Amino acid sequence: SAYGSEKGIHDLHNQGFPLVMVNRFQPEDVGKIETISVDNYHAGYDATRYLIRTGHKRIAFAYGREELIFYRERYRGYCDALKDAGLPYDEHLVMRETSGAECFYHLTRALMELPQPPDAIFASSDPKAFVIMHALHDLGKRIPADVSVLGFDNVAMASMVEPPLSTMAQPFREIGATAAKSVIRQIRYKEEHGVLPPANSYVMAYDLIIRRSTN
């Protein structure tokens, strides 16, 4: 869970409980506790590069809770992609979560009132993208003619909203299967050796799903 207790997880691990951390972990956890994630940095980079390649110059970013490493890594990829393309970083184009995904409704409306509003918005999760699209619709903005919107996750609703959401897909089924196999491996190893095995770190593939919310 993205909202679990890291201290509780580390306490369980120190007591010898088999577990795996999915997406939410710190760099120092790698090699100590089993971890699974997509390459969030390169996914954020590639998402931003896609928007740049399709002609966008003013790309906003919807940032999630900054204490969560996967949001930080997606943001870092966004920043580096802008830099490598020679586009200026503009703090005014970064919307920061204050009270859950619903806060992005008002943040998006404020964003579009800028003298130079964005021509694309990269949301660090699909739920944020849905709220952003709602705000843009209410403002009379056309997606993607006026503003392209790109999400992250590829949750089921992404293909059902109007227009269907372009997004960076995480392989949720494979992540779940890998997590289950990891726990089983740890249980069997501990039964045989009395301790947990050396920790593995699994980095899963991501995929850009292009739908009609981007040009």
Language-model features: where?
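Bacterial carbohydrate/catabolite-sensing allosteric modules
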Residues: 6-215
